[in-house]
A protein has these predicted regions:
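Proline-centered helix-kink/hinge sites
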Residues: 35-36, 59, 164-165, 188, ...
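Small-residue hotspots at the loop-to-helix junctions and early N-terminal turns
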Residues: 46-50, 179-183
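Short hydrophobic/aromatic, small-residue-rich stretches within specific transmembrane helices
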Residues: 53-57, 182, 186, 207-212
Length: 257
C-alpha cells in the first residue's frame, strides 16, 4: 500500500464528495459506482476495489442513516429485524455464491433492476398520489432484508437498490422513509463485509480514507436534498438511477474486460 500523490489525494476526495452526495440523495453507499472507478482508474483487482469501496461506504451509510432518521424516525422493530435478516442472508448467500457464475448473476440482477426502474418510472410519470398505499401487510416488512441481503451476498452491492423500491411499492412507504429503512438494513451488512475484507488484507486505506473524507463532507447535503424534493420527483430520480445502474451492469463486463 503506497501513499497517493497530492493530485491523487484531491481526486479521491472529489470522487468521495460526489459519491457522498449521490449516496445521501438516494440512500445508498455508492459502492456500485466506486468499485468500477477504483478498478479502472486505480488498477485495483475486484476484491481490493470492493474492500476499499466499503471503507468509504460505511461512514457514508452511518452518517446518512443518522441524518435520515432525524428527519423521518425509522420504525425501529421492523428496521432491526430487517437489518438482522439482511446480515444473516448476506453471510449465507455469500458462502453459496462463491460457486456460482458471477457474470450470469450480474446479468440477472441488472435485468431485475431494469424492470424495477422502468416500472417505478412509469408509475411516477402517470397519475400519482402523494400518499402511497400498501399492498402487503407491514408485518412482512422485515423480510425485505432477505432480498437486500441476498443482493449484497451475491454481488457485494445493490442492497439498497433492491430494498428501496420494494418498500415504496409493496409497503407504501414514502421515498425518503424507504431510503432511510434501506440504509438501516444495508449498514450492518457493509460493516461486517468491511471487517471481512480488512481481515483478508483487501482494503487500501490510503485510498479509502480520502474517499471517506470527501463523502462525509457532502452526504448531509444529499440527505437534505432528498427531503426537499417532492415525492414524485424523488421517485422519478430513483427510477432513472436504477435504469442507468442496470444498463451499466449489463455493459460492465465488456468495458472492464
Amino acid at each position: 500500500m503506497s501513499l497517493p500523490s497530492l493530485i491523487d489525494l484531491f481526486s479521491l476526495m472529489a470522487l468521495g464528495a460526489a459519491l457522498g452526495l449521490f449516496g445521501g440523495l438516494f440512500g445508498i453507499g455508492g459502492g456500485i459506482i466506486a468499485v468500477p472507478v477504483l478498478a479502472l482508474g486505480f488498477g485495483m483487482g475486484q476484491a481490493l476495489a470492493q474492500g476499499t469501496s466499503l471503507s468509504m461506504m460505511v461512514p457514508i451509510l452511518i452518517v446518512g442513516l443518522w441524518k435520515y432518521s432525524r428527519k423521518h424516525p425509522i420504525p425501529l422493530p421492523s428496521a432491526i429485524y430487517a437489518a438482522l435478516l439482511a446480515s444473516l442472508t448476506t453471510y449465507f448467500v455469500a458462502e453459496f455464491a462463491t460457486d456460482l457464475d458471477q457474470g450470469a448473476l450480474r446479468a440477472i440482477f441488472a435485468s431485475f433492476l431494469l424492470i424495477l426502474g422502468v416500472q417505478m418510472g412509469w408509475k411516477s410519470s402517470g397519475r400519482f398520489s402523494e400518499k402511497p398505499t400498501s399492498i402487503v401487510s407491514p408485518k412482512w416488512m422485515p423480510f425485505v432484508g432477505c432480498f437486500g441481503g441476498g443482493s449484497m451476498g451475491l454481488l457485494g452491492v445493490g442492497g439498497g437498490l433492491v430494498a428501496t423500491p420494494m418498500l415504496t411499492y409493496l409497503f407504501g412507504q414514502r421515498q425518503a422513509l424507504a431510503q432511510s429503512i434501506s440504509m438501516a438494513l444495508v449498514t450492518p451488512c457493509a460493516i461486517v463485509a468491511l471487517f471481512t475484507y480488512n481481515a483478508a488484507d483487501a482494503v487500501d486505506w490510503s485510498v479509502g480514507f480520502p474517499l471517506a473524507l470527501g463523502g462525509l463532507a457532502t452526504v448531509s447535503r444529499g440527505v437534505s436534498l432528498a427531503h426537499a424534493l417532492p415525492e414524485q420527483k424523488m421517485r422519478s430520480l430513483f427510477s432513472g438511477m436504477l435504469v442507468v445502474t442496470a444498463l451499466f451492469l449489463l455493459i460492465k463486463p465488456y468495458v472492464m474486460h
